[in-house]
């Protein structure tokens, strides 16, 4: 038997398709999302509707974004969901969530079992729309969730941790084994809740500067910041900010990265591209 076939659909590797089929896990996720009528619920990658059906049962309207043409067509003719759905057959990476929020007249509640092959770039895409998003609930590779929630002085802490925590409060919800999917992925999964900050705890003047600093620091994470960020900051400047130049990228807090970004914005701003 081909374990890539589920409900008559052949899972496509190029779309990173693994279909959720564990009822306990599905119920736990829907309970964590707690969808309510009248909310602007948006699902990314509904697939074979494992989450779409129980969420849709509680709603009058649901927006879904599905890249796979066959799956989008199945949803359109779904016996009870079809009339409730607004279906965008496109890549979520090309979706303007700000425009979608404006259309729906309120901040979005976004959820989904994200394809693991695009989960990190998709997270960065969504971060750029956090002013249009109320919250997000995603199934991700467990290793990615560990990175999202990691704090300084840990191996999992990296650029994704800093940028996610800059924009959102990040809360792990539950772990999910490979056996909950068809076909089973080779890795463990986990569900995470991301709630955009109502007030930024460490606002930066130019997000591009924070992005640049974290990229340069974590691309050379074994080096001290005296070396990895030496082209941006002198030892004296770091010391004045109360940041030890002998620290590595993984030792620096989100607040300190934001402090460095604001110093650079004031003293050596990026040119407009």
From Swiss-Prot:
Q: Where in the cell is it found?
A: Cytoplasm
Annotated InterPro entries: KsgA/Erm (IPR001737), rRNA_Ade_diMease-like_C (IPR023165), rRNA_Ade_Mease_Trfase_CS (IPR020596), rRNA_Ade_methylase_Trfase_N (IPR020598), rRNA_adenine_dimethylase (IPR011530), SAM-dependent_MTases_sf (IPR029063)
TM ranges are none
Q: A GO CC term?
A: cytosol
What's its top-level EC category?
transferase
| E.C. number(s) listed in UniProt | 2.1.1.182
Q: What's one GO MF term for it? A: 16S rRNA (adenine(1518)-N(6)/adenine(1519)-N(6))-dimethyltransferase activity
Q: Does the keyword Zinc apply?
A: no
What reaction is this protein's catalytic activity?
Answer: adenosine(1518)/adenosine(1519) in 16S rRNA + 4 S-adenosyl-L-methionine = N(6)-dimethyladenosine(1518)/N(6)-dimethyladenosine(1519) in 16S rRNA + 4 S-adenosyl-L-homocysteine + 4 H(+)
Q: Which residues form a coiled coil?
A: none
What positions does the entry give for S-adenosyl-L-methionine binding?
18, 20, 45, 66, 91, 113
Keyword terms, alphabetized: Cytoplasm, Methyltransferase, RNA-binding, rRNA processing, S-adenosyl-L-methionine, Transferase
- Keyword Transferase, does the record have it? yes
**PANTHER family noted in UniProt:** DIMETHYLADENOSINE TRANSFERASE, DIMETHYLADENOSINE TRANSFERASE-RELATED
What family is this? Answer: Belongs to the class I-like SAM-binding methyltransferase superfamily. rRNA adenine N(6)-methyltransferase family. RsmA subfamily.
Function statement:
Specifically dimethylates two adjacent adenosines (A1518 and A1519) in the loop of a conserved hairpin near the 3'-end of 16S rRNA in the 30S particle. May play a critical role in biogenesis of 30S subunits.
- Name of this protein: Ribosomal RNA small subunit methyltransferase A
Gene giving rise to this polypeptide: rsmA
